[in-house]
């Protein structure tokens, strides 16, 4: 196992260690979240964790959790989530995130917003000083509106292109049946909170991948002297 995967596994385990019996859990999407789901399943099977139920943020996560025997509920059937654990594509020092590399950010944001505590689990490569310099900001749009939204985003200073599928002809289609515009700002994102609101106010936009004022804790996997460890970051 390479160092990056070791970091992901360590940080996923650290997050699972915070889970208590009887919790309703938000189970995130992506490679690190998948490791967290696997670690949770092991603890449930051993009896170390009991009476928990998960709410997944993607079809991928639902399939994995079901296969591993984790009890699940739909998002619409819960009014509150005790603890949500998810990864991120970028994290800045203020715990503001870009998510949506897996095109699941709408459900991910809904789950994070319902959570009493939202923990983000990442390896050290996801830490940045400024968002959007390296990773594009996903914006989920109605299929009939993507051209109009694309033009409006230009007025905000962003260049957005449809995310194309890798193993089928045409664009990526989300779990909600929508399209994704991946957005780049030449100098990165200066004011994430303002931009999140501006983008979501565009007609035809369902949600964007900026997560602002949602994250309670960031657990990061790090390597020092070839030893893998986990650090809980402090918000600036």
Curated annotation (Swiss-Prot):
Disulfide bonds listed in the record: none
GO molecular function: ribose-5-phosphate isomerase activity
EC top class named in words: isomerase
Keyword set includes Isomerase: yes
A biological process term (GO) from this entry: D-ribose metabolic process
Reaction catalyzed: aldehydo-D-ribose 5-phosphate = D-ribulose 5-phosphate
UniProt similarity note: Belongs to the ribose 5-phosphate isomerase family.
Role description: Catalyzes the reversible conversion of ribose-5-phosphate to ribulose 5-phosphate.
Protein name: Ribose-5-phosphate isomerase A
